[in-house]
Amino acid sequence: EPYRRQRQMCIRDRRLAPHVPHLFKAVYTGTQADIKRALKAEEMGQLLDTKCTRKQSELLQKTHHLFVLMFLLRGLPFVDLAYIQKKDLNGNILTYHRRKTGRQITITVTKDAMNIIREYMDTTTESPYLFPILSAEGGEDTIYREYQQALRIFNYQLTKLGELLGLTTELTSYTARHTWATLAYYLEVHPGIIREAMGHSSIKVTETYLKPFNIKKLDETNLSIIGYAKRSFEG
């Protein structure tokens, strides 16, 4: 967009640049949607140790623990975490509909995930929401503004958490989701299963998540095959 504005300024002065219709038609000036950031397995393992922030502020600890919970719940998006209701949790079974796609998701909650839920769940009778991220007051617009504010705070605290732990990958509310999908891919889970687990609207969405890691995995496969051939000859 800045290039378009600069060119328009030059076109106004015909001595600087001629007008060429649809000059930018075939030029992509946005951001690549398929570039996703995921943590390495060892980095996610470090984050799964929920005690590593016990000396930090209460807000940072909560952010850390909720991030871990999102990973434990199959890469749960923050928007779904915020909007999940108490009635969606029945014993250790969580059933909810994704805000983005409307697809129903059913998850068996692990012991570690349940411990985090019990620590941070809203225990009041006034709110229908499982976590005290949104209030039950006001209309949909008010609640959505609350969600946006909560998301900004969450991402800011995640940045601080990443710096504290010395992570090489920037932490955002999407990192848990991308990490879950990527680790599943490296464990050779079929993309169709990953799609169902994450509630994607189509397999193409899942492939978008995994595309940046295809080359690396193919390179690793190539090295494994070469190594296997060498060992077979030496043996």
Language-model-detected regions and their locations in the chain:
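Conserved tyrosine-mediated DNA breakage-rejoining catalytic core shared by Y-recombinases
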Residues: 19-26, 83-119
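DNA/chromatin major-groove-contacting recognition/catalytic segments
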Residues: 18, 106-111, 115, 120, ...
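Single conserved hydrophobic/aromatic residue that forms the stacking wall/gate
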Residues: 1-7, 11
